[in-house]
Curated annotation (Swiss-Prot):
Pfam families: T-box. Its main location: nucleus. It comes from Danio rerio (Zebrafish). This is T-box transcription factor TBX1. It is found in: Nucleus. Probable transcriptional regulator involved in developmental processes. Binds to the palindromic T site 5'-TTCACACCTAGGTGTGAA-3' DNA sequence. Is required for normal development of the pharyngeal arch arteries. Acts cell autonomously in the pharyngeal mesendoderm and influences the development of neural crest-derived cartilages secondarily. Keywords: Developmental protein, DNA-binding, Nucleus, Transcription, Transcription regulation. The gene is tbx1. Residues 67-84, 320-330 have a biased composition (Polar residues). Gene3D superfamilies: Transcription factor, T-box. Expressed in the ear and mesendodermal components of pharyngeal arches. Binds DNA as a dimer. GO terms for cellular component: chromatin; nucleus. PANTHER family: T-BOX PROTEIN-RELATED, T-BOX TRANSCRIPTION FACTOR TBX1.
Length: 460
């Protein structure tokens, strides 16, 4: 079991406690007859057996699985309870209860983001598994209390099947149905928190996050990820292991750890989300899924930058610098000229949020026709994203004659990026201000009265 996860400190830890003994003891009851069942949640159709430990408070499970009549999954730990289920290591009636080491007996654990877990649990939590491995969301995070500040502890997690069933999702009824018996069991693995081992004071002073844990369906995975079967239900377990300095610590392996089970973290492993409500909730609550949000711009927070899809859509409707100039009538030319007029101070008179948005997200410099020098992006006042108007915007001309930028310097205001040197030296172009009649092919585009006269593309 342990060999699947290569940790440099694991070998050094061998003289403190027998980690292999703990792992073997913790996982040995996976297929052991008589192992006690996970406690039922109200309305959970799985559970028709008495639980042998006190369940942690959790919202009602809304998994609409049908055809299942049991939920067998072992869990081990101390007989006391905390904010989650803390189960007995002696599950069978003919075994004596193991007295826990005082270093772990008083440890309590509180699940972080419990309200979010409850919200997912009511819908039926799904977790994506991929060949390369996928992180969990919500992330498993806990706050720990009651450790000995000067003692060393290891924190680890494993995942146990809830039952011996395989499931499928019925879209017509928006419910999970039993599809048959479970696939062969995957290799049992545990995930060690990368900061293990550490002093109790270190663990208790901050929230412990298992954000590095990844789930995979690759049976040949050699990266130490947790291997799960898709379309099966799993229960995460959290273990606290006291690093016993005694040389014969393997004799006390069952005394030196405590296990916690949060039933609201139970989930179904999937390769793609089945319940569209789960998809929506993940997008709405995951800060890394902002690009997938499809909501009214009026609902955007003022400091929220819209996703790349909206940005590229706006960019596609504005202009293409390399395209040929379109033919315009007089009204369109006047609108375009007024759109890009500037006041004497150099500030753009227009307040077009699309171009202001482009000035924040495009590359540091845009090449000018002919490769003369780099044209900067404006650093004018930012407009809040909720004012973005993608429809009804007058189409600017696809030509650099109406370029909205004035000063030929590189852009220094986007995320503090350093300037990039222009591909050609600036002195060679000094004094060559742009004039629309320099190119005979474009001389007839403007009349004497409508030609823009305040465009100066020369360096300052």
């Amino acid at each position: 079991m342990i060999s699947a996860i290569s940790s440099p400190w694991l070998t050094q830890l061998s003289h403190f406690c027998d980690v292999a003994a703990f792992t073997t003891s913790s996982l040995s009851s996976l297929n052991t007859p008589g192992s006690y069942h996970l406690s039922p949640s109200p309305g959970d159709p799985y559970s028709h057996h008495e639980s042998q430990f006190e369940p942690c408070p959790a919202a009602q499970h809304a998994y609409n699985y049908s055809g299942s009549n049991s939920a067998q999954a072992p869990a081990q730990g101390d007989s006391g309870t905390s904010n989650c289920s803390s189960s007995s290591s002696s599950s069978t009636p003919n075994k004596t209860l193991v007295k826990k080491n005082p270093k772990v007996a008083n440890i309590n654990v509180q699940l972080e983001m419990k309200a979010l877990w409850d919200e997912f649990n009511q819908l039926g939590t799904e977790m994506i598994v991929t060949k390369a491995g996928r992180r969990m969301f919500p992330t498993f995070q806990v706050k720990i209390f009651g450790m000995d500040p000067m003692a060393d502890y290891m924190l680890l997690m494993d995942f146990l099947p809830v039952d011996d069933k395989r499931y499928r999702y019925a879209f017509h009824s928006s419910s999970w149905l039993v599809a048959g018996k479970a696939d062969p069991a995957t290799p049992g693995r545990v995930h060690y928190h990368p900061d293990s081992p550490a002093k109790g004071a270190q663990w208790m002073k901050q929230i412990v996050s298992f954000d590095k844990l990844k789930l995979t369906n690759n049976l040949l995975d050699d990266n130490g990820h947790i291997i799960l079967n898709s379309m099966h239900r799993y229960q995460p377990r959290f273990h606290v292991v006291y690093v016993d300095p005694r040389k014969d610590s393997e004799k006390y392996a069952e005394e030196n750890y405590k296990t916690f089970v949060f039933e609201e973290t139970r989930f179904t492993a999937v390769t793609a989300y089945q319940n569209h409500r789960i998809t929506q909730l993940k997008i709405a609550s995951n800060p890394f899924a902002k690009g997938f949000r499809d909501c009214d711009p009026e609902d955007w927070p003022r400091n929220h930058r819209p996703g790349s899809l909206q940005i590229m859509s706006a960019f596609a409707r504005t202009r293409n610098p390399m395209s040929s100039p379109p033919q315009q009538n007089g009204t369109e030319k006047e609108d375009s000229r007024r759109e890009y007029d500037r006041d004497p101070s150099g500030n753009p008179l227009h307040s077009d949020p699309t171009h202001q948005l482009m000035s924040r997200v495009l590359s540091p410099a845009l090449p000018v026709l002919g490769g003369l020098h780099a044209v900067p992006l404006t650093a004018g006042p930012r407009s809040p994203p909720h004012e973005l108007r993608l429809d009804g915007h007058p189409q600017p001309p696809d030509t650099l004659h109406h370029h909205p930028y004035k000063y030929p310097a590189t852009y220094e205001h986007y995320l503090g990026a350093k300037t990039r040197p222009s591909p050609y030296p600036s002195p060679s172009i000094r004094g060559h201000g742009y004039h629309p009649h320099m190119n005979p092919t474009t001389a007839n585009m403007y009349s004497a009265t409508s030609a823009p006269t305040n465009y100066d593309y020369g360096p300052r």
